A protein has these predicted regions:
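Bacterial N-terminal signal peptides that target proteins for export
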Residues: 2-10
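Bacterial N-terminal signal peptides
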Residues: 9-17
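Terminal accessory carbohydrate-recognition/targeting modules of carbohydrate-active enzymes
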Residues: 22-247
Length: 247
């Protein structure tokens, strides 16, 4: 009951505290009821050691949250996940998935638009190579679905920005597993066509250039038992992502 009360209090404070989150760019944003409410919350925050976060995007009863990156402290991906458990409350990563072009590792992206919609985070950013659009929606309490679209038709490279302290990262085929000593786990599940390799306590995933969207499942678990069952669900969701987004 204490956990439930704390979560309700947190989300109520978020809703009451912020306005004008959306900075729409000129690109078309999909139509639908949720897109009529594009300036409700300001949850722009890039994790650092100097300032505190004031609110997170969470949904479907999840205990993980995300924020939009600040335009003046940009990372090219949604920030988080953050563990909302009252006994831990920690950033598992500054950004578990950042996106760039594989042949331009040091290219600088300029933010075009960041936005919170009810049930969705949205961002787009551009470089000299092209524009990358990302959307994040929760599928259930454990997993959020990241959608990535690039207009350049070039190979993409995905990696994490600054995993949290004490987190150990390993790769297993098309899955990245990041474990914290507390028992909390972040798992990133990629589709079979994505090449994933481990680096120095991190990962790099490469995606062939395509006009189609790329999907990544970002999951949060409190222990190994949840992980083993959850990975199968994440893989199933990636096999038909549009069906999960309808739920």
């Amino acid at each position: 009951m204490k956990h439930k009360f704390t979560k309700i209090t947190l989300l109520t404070a978020v809703v009451a505290g912020f306005t004008a989150a959306c900075n729409p760019a000129s690109e078309n944003i999909p139509t639908g009821k949720r897109y009529e409410f594009n300036n409700i919350l300001d949850i722009a925050y890039t994790p650092d050691t100097l300032t505190r976060c004031r609110g997170w995007f969470t949904d479907a009863g999840s205990w993980m949250g995300f924020t939009l990156p600040q335009k003046d402290h940009w990372v090219n991906g949604f920030c988080g996940p953050f563990s909302l458990d009252m006994n831990r409350r920690q950033w598992m990563a500054q950004s578990a998935v950042t996106v760039g072009y594989a042949d331009q590792a040091n290219v600088i992206f300029t933010p075009d638009s960041t936005c919170y919609f009810p049930g969705e985070l949205y961002l787009s950013a551009s470089s000299e190579e092209g524009k990358i659009i990302q959307r994040l929606n929760f599928l259930d309490a454990s997993t959020a679905l990241l959608r990535i679209h690039s207009d350049a038709g070039k190979e993409l490279s995905l990696t994490a920005s600054q995993w949290g302290k004490e987190i150990q990262v390993q790769t297993d085929q098309n899955t990245v597993i990041a474990r914290h000593p507390s028992g909390e786990i972040v798992a990133l599940t990629f589709t079979p066509d994505v090449s994933v390799k481990g680096t120095d306590n991190n990962y790099q995933a490469k995606i062939n250039g395509s006009e189609h969207d790329t999907y990544v499942a970002i999951s949060f678990y409190t222990g190994e038992k949840e992980l083993s069952a959850g990975l199968q669900k994440a893989q199933l969701a990636l096999s038909n992502p549009q069906e999960g987004l309808k739920a």
